[in-house]
Amino acid sequence: MKFGAIDIGTNAARLLIGEVIQEDGKKFVNKVSYTRIPLRLGESVFESGRINKRKSEQFVKTMRAFQLISELFEVKELRACATSAMREAKNGKKIKNKIFQETGIEVETISGNEEANLIFGTFFLMDIDKA
């Protein structure tokens, strides 16, 4: 089964598509596709407290592209997590609603602690040599 993970950060949005493989009794994640778009959401958020119209439109287009890529690779599970810039953006909820309406992707804004836990957990779940 293929899964997708979308990381929406301050500087870039990333889509990782992977597949869990079992080999010799060990499980590891086989990277199927990786896409990075340098959105730079933080530029407008840290200046004005909001994601400006241009960045918002780029963000929605990026999520549309990620949704299409996920369909192409027949992703069964997709999780989208947003971090610092979306936590700070006064219009973050409105943008998340627009993304959901246009793509069906629900963007989850996570805390700094949850972000650290996900990074830590992912590190120990992956066989780095195989990733």
Label every PLM stretch briefly.
Residues 11-13:
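Conserved Rossmann-like nucleotide-cofactor binding loop
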